[in-house]
Amino acid sequence: MDNLERKIETGSLYKLDKNFLLTKVDKKYRITNGPAFIDKLNFYHTDSSKKKIYKIKINKKNKILKKTLFKKFNSAEGSPDGMTLDKNKNLWVAHYHGACISVFNKKAELLTRINFPAKNITNCAFGGRNNNELFVTTAKKGMSKAEMQKYRYS
């Protein structure tokens, strides 16, 4: 990621099929993240730079049937980055520059927010023996010495 990506919509969403054929599904993103699939034809996808999460419905040929804004973050919340779904289809979203993970229901209502001692949360995924442990990744990029002291686990 560089500063140019924050201004120009060069990012795209692709699908790689079982025969390794690459198909562009959507374009005009700045910094793409996700996706997190609800089912075979519905998923969430982010444009981190625009601070937006979209809900996308595709058909069996991977054409977008509907793309709606699911959630727009404000500056204080940071940017939505990686994400995952739990067994109840709640969306868990990593906040880059936000030091937390938020959990939203299908109506985009905030269920809970989990604060972390790391400023840049980049992704989260469930794993472990019973798939009930959350694994989280972080980044230090662009952090000052003072921020590194405050967010020791970055």
Regions found by a protein language model. Give the residues of each.
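Short coil turn/linker residues within repeat-based beta-strand modules
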Residues: 18-20, 50, 60, 98, ...
